[in-house]
């Protein structure tokens, strides 16, 4: 995005660039669904195309992050500290990085999720992405929160949304346990290194939900300080 466009967003609302970045990060993460679907069919050429899409999207998110860091005006009349806003951008940018890393590691190993685990695994990925979408919804709601001076019913709504984000992350924890148990019952069929790789993939997908929760926690901390 051009520098003057970023400045224009800041002029309209100091939170708009943050929301734009969150939107891009969410877009990157969502690309994991078609990526994993191509790995299920062992179509590694098509999976590589999807990985490149994720990588390009991550670069765009990174560019937005850098522009925000460089152009976030000082002396904003906000009940939020500038440093807190920059830290929030850093935390949500990690989501795009993790999506890129997951796809890259899958392509590097070219070893897919066992067929009997694929349906449950895809549910798990989608639930982890639900956490990212919930974090994005909280970011989108912050404009209204700004209008109310970070208080009242809007503050309660945002806090409730963050609690829902925590609940989604709890769901992914339980789904991760279930997937590990499924893998344990079939791991004797596979090379031990491949088995360890599968356990790591399950863990990495869970990190997406964990990181989305960290974004929510960062917002919660910002609100407590405001």
From Swiss-Prot:
Gene3D superfamilies: Phosphate transport system protein phou homolog 2, domain 2. PANTHER family: UPF0111 PROTEIN HI_1603. This is UPF0111 protein HI_1603. Pfam families: PhoU_div. Belongs to the UPF0111 family. It comes from Haemophilus influenzae (strain ATCC 51907 / DSM 11121 / KW20 / Rd).
